[in-house]
Amino acid sequence: MARAVEILAQVYEKNRAARNTPPVPIDRPVVLANEHVVFELGKTTRVQVERAFGVAFAFPMRGWHTYAAREDAERRFLSLFYAESGLVALEYYVPKLAGTPSLSPRDYGAFRLTPGDVALGASTATLDERYVTAVGGPAPVVYAEAFEVRFPGGVAYVMGNGGRVERLGLYTAT
């Protein structure tokens, strides 16, 4: 019995140490794209986005620029954050809070996170091997599942509940 407990403790310690180690970055940027715009951190500008989508609504707080999108007959939010007109953070998600603004959704086309062709509503089980359990990322307060892929200059998160993707995020690494 003591030997079994010792083995379980070793497995736990090994997994705990591995879980706190960030994954090795892939060799190319992760982007969110549709047929109108490719959102790439540090390269996409506010002018490019506003030319394609118009002026955004300030939500969830000052500094964020949010558009309501319609995809698969559902309302989604695309929130962008810029520094000196360049994109530094992006979130594409299914709004979950009761107090979200009643913005009229527009059909911007389907958005996908690449590499991996990850879409909102997709099964988290279909994520490829580049997406690993998130390390030090989103806490499981709103989303029970969080996966990440790191890339030069940033990190991408895929978050969901019940095996379904509900939020995609790109953030500049600091």
Protein language model features and the residues they cover:
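Short helix/turn-capping signatures at newly exposed starts of structured segments
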Residues: 1-143, 159-174
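Short, exposed beta-strand-loop hairpins at the edges of beta-sheets
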Residues: 148-150, 154-162
